[in-house]
A protein has these predicted regions:
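Generic structural detector for well-ordered beta-strands
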Residues: 64-66, 80, 137-139, 153, ...
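Low-complexity, intrinsically disordered segments enriched in Ser/Thr together with acidic residues
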Residues: 137-161
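Bacterial N-terminal signal peptides that target proteins for export
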Residues: 1-7
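Helix-rich interaction surfaces within compact, conserved domain-sized segments
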Residues: 156-194
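N-terminal secretory signal peptides
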Residues: 22-128, 160, 164-167
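C-terminal segment of classical bacterial N-terminal signal peptides
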Residues: 11-20
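Strand-loop-strand motifs at the edges of beta-sheets in extracellular beta-sandwich domains
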Residues: 130-138
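Solvent-exposed residues in well-ordered beta-strands and their adjoining turns
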Residues: 66-68, 82, 141, 155-157, ...
Length: 194
């Protein structure tokens, strides 16, 4: 009898019980803290990088926003970049920032930009674990209509001197509004291509 009980106990110890613990169910069912990391899929934005090597001063970033992400006409774009980008000698050429109608695969007409401002060391608030961000504000001469796809282009970027995983966030501001609306995040592996 004891042998049979011992066999049953050792079998259950080897096989184990396939019941999730309370901690496991909290991780998978919770909308709160994501221990693994990453941006929720509904906030992920598409992008394309060209000349994506370390220290390359001819890098080109195309960052797409689908029309269904923006439900009001937009007059200002706010792009935030973690300060690690500039700490590792990355530079964005402010004179080579463009905004186009359309998606990356089919760029349309360029949208005229009124002014581009750079503000470094801005507290991020939410959506990013870094406290220090660099902010680029793009003021448009004409509004981007609601539900219209557009692409932000950073041309002649000087990539950092090391590979970085960067969460580049986008907020938009409709004309006449005071509060910006978070649209999404481009999770970009910068200066990684060999």
């Amino acid at each position: 009898r004891l042998g049979l009980v011992g066999l049953a106990m050792s079998a259950s110890a080897v096989v184990g019980l396939n019941l999730p613990s309370l901690a496991q169910t909290d991780i998978y069912d919770s909308d709160g803290l994501n221990i693994i990391g990453g941006v929720e899929s509904r906030y992920q934005l598409s992008y394309r990088l060209a000349n994506n090597t370390r220290r390359n001063s001819r890098a080109n970033y195309l960052m797409e926003v689908k029309g269904d992400k923006v439900d009001a006409a937009v007059s200002k774009l706010i792009v935030t970049i973690p300060e690690a980008f500039t700490r590792y000698s990355g530079r964005i050429n402010m004179d080579r920032i463009k905004v186009h109608y359309g998606r990356i695969s089919n760029l349309g007409d360029e949208i005229v930009i009124d002014e581009v401002l750079w503000d470094d060391r801005v507290f991020s608030g939410a959506q990013d674990l870094s406290e220090d961000l660099d902010r680029i504000e793009i003021f448009l001469t004409e509004d981007i209509p609601a539900n219209t796809s557009f692409t932000i282009e950073f041309d002649r970027v000087r990539n950092p001197n090391r590979a970085l995983m960067q969460r580049v966030n986008l907020q938009v501001l409709p004309r006449g509004e005071e509060l910006a609306t978070y649209v999404g995040t481009w999770e970009m592996l910068i200066a990684y291509q060999d």
